[in-house]
Amino acid sequence: MASLAAANAEFGFDLFREMDSSQGNGNVFFSSLSIFTALTLIRLGARGDCARQIDKALHFNIPSRQGNSSNNQPGLQYQLKRVLADINSSHKDYELSIATGVFAEKVYDFHKNYIECAENLYNAKVERVDFTNDVQDTRFKINKWIENETHGKIKKVLGDSSLSSSAVMVLVNAVYFKGKWKSAFTKTDTLSCRFRSPTCPGKVVNMMHQERRFNLSTIQQPPMQVLELQYHGGISMYIMLPEDGLCEIESKLSFQNLMDWTNRRKMKSQYVNVFLPQFKIEKNYEMTHHLKSLGLKDIFDESSADLSGIASGGRLYVSKLMHKSFIEVSEEGTEATAATENNIVEKQLPESTVFRADRPFLFVIKKNDIILFTGKVSCP
């Protein structure tokens, strides 16, 4: 799975840096895998420069384990199919769903093989709609579909004025995750603390606290601590807490560096005194500007787009790409769990390392080597 993991990570970190720089010092949260999937869906029908721009942005030319650096897009698509099949199947330990839809004006006729590939490879919805004559009803139906696909958790991806009757093709993408910590925090241990951030100077936050064994690494360059918080079901959140500011970490984000920072040989199981703020981030991004900044210009340009492998009926291009994601981090993860042996703390603890996230930090949520989410908490 190395090539998909690497391509998804490199694309996600490129996108994170672009989104972070364009929105100032705010919180950031998105699913790179989800947006990666949406763009791969477009790649199925892209031709010429359109296809080459997508390949470059998605790092489809990353060398494989065999050292072959030629375009390995078909292999990546097969890997992605397997990952998405696992994600969208039901799991008793967590809820995770990705919903991706391609909606085009009804004058365009989707190619049958494109619909089959989109549905079979990515479980995506492909549908002809009436933007021209009934844009509000179309918006309502798309929002309702996303709401159903995410079990009612994500609503109104498309706002009241987000679509116009001149829309040609719209990609809508939403992702929802609900997990339970393996080692839940205790609510009575939550403290009120000040969060040190220029974004919200002096803000008092609910700081969760627990002391037990965690996987932790201390990185010298860039200087930071990396803490692993495990969810049930093989998913982990890795929190990157800098000694000083985040700039150096952000500039060094790469798949290889993340693998190094979270390497099992480097992360030692040790007693850690953890302080982590509760936080909730809900983001609804219109991705066009961000993706253009990564070199994906042609798919959004009526005069340049070549998406002839998707549909016939005229020159097709992407009018809008919407992405919505939501996360809430609390004591239980997201819902209370019964006590297990993981929640039993020894009475006599050895000296602990302190991990105090009372300043801005980065985090990724991943399963195995696949990054599901990337985020930045500037102000909880």
Curated annotation (Swiss-Prot):
Entry-linked Gene3D superfamilies: Alpha-1-antitrypsin, domain 1, Antithrombin, subunit I, domain 2
Presence of the UniProt keyword Phosphoprotein in the record: yes
Cell compartments where the protein resides: Cytoplasm
Principal location class: cytoplasm
Marked site: Reactive bond: K347, Q348
Keyword set, alphabetical order: Cytoplasm, Phosphoprotein, Protease inhibitor, Serine protease inhibitor
CDD domains (alphabetical): serpinB7_megsin
Residues annotated with Phosphoserine modification: S217
Record keyword Phosphoprotein present: yes
SMART domains registered for this protein in UniProt: SERPIN (SM00093)
GO molecular function: serine-type endopeptidase inhibitor activity
GO cellular component: cytoplasm; extracellular space
InterPro entries: Serpin_CS, Serpin_dom, Serpin_fam, Serpin_sf, Serpin_sf_1, Serpin_sf_2
Database matches in Pfam families: Serpin
Biological process, per Gene Ontology: positive regulation of collagen biosynthetic process; positive regulation of glomerular mesangial cell proliferation; positive regulation of platelet-derived growth factor production; positive regulation of transforming growth factor beta1 production; regulation of proteolysis
Family classification: Belongs to the serpin family. Ov-serpin subfamily.
Role, per record: Might function as an inhibitor of Lys-specific proteases. Might influence the maturation of megakaryocytes via its action as a serpin.
Protein name: Serpin B7
Lineage summary: Eukaryota, Metazoa, Chordata, Craniata, Vertebrata
